Amino acid sequence: CLARHRVKATFFCTANFALHAKDLILDIQKGGHEIASHGFYHSSFETADLRKSKEALEELTGQPVNGFRMARMMPGEEEEIHKAGYLYNSSLNPTCIPGRYNHLGQPRTYFMKDGVLQLPASVTPIVRFPLFWLAYHNLPASLYRKLALWTWKEDGYFLTYFHPWEFTSL
């Protein structure tokens, strides 16, 4: 589907998954897509995993790994992300999700923090309605499209994310 529409994407992969699905990761890379880090494991995180996952993905792909996204879009220590060698972090969802996080005080669009480019997930202007996978699956398609286009026109880009399991029948 991406190739048909000439769309390039970033695939944030845990190193553990990549090491168990090497051929898939290399096929994604051959399609011209970026491979970025989603940590070593999705279920647990240690600061050492920042560097460890980056190195494992770089060894597998033979390419630099520049991006990081924390599992569950939880906050990370920017200084540690920078020290591990990442150029950008896409872990911020600049909205309020009760019981999860409140990032209403953070910028809605890209910004620099502690030497790392921050690429937040897109949220609508004004009310900061999150336009991530959950909205995509639960809003009427026409409404999601209108909100996404409004955000794209306002911000000059649109950044959303999906998980591989969303494209399979479970």
Regions found by a protein language model. Give the residues of each.
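Acidic-and-aromatic substrate-binding clefts and catalytic sites of carbohydrate-active enzymes
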Residues: 10-22, 41-48, 69-76, 96-101
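Short low-complexity, flexible loop/linker segments enriched in glycine and/or proline
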Residues: 25-28, 51-53, 82, 103-107
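Histidine-centered catalytic micro-motifs
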Residues: 35-41
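Short, solvent-exposed beta-strand-terminating loops
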Residues: 163-170
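Active-site beta->alpha N-cap acidic-glycine motif
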Residues: 1-34, 83
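An active-site-proximal "capping" alpha-helix that borders the catalytic cofactor pocket
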Residues: 48-59
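Active-site-adjacent pocket scaffolds in enzyme catalytic domains
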Residues: 58-59, 63-161
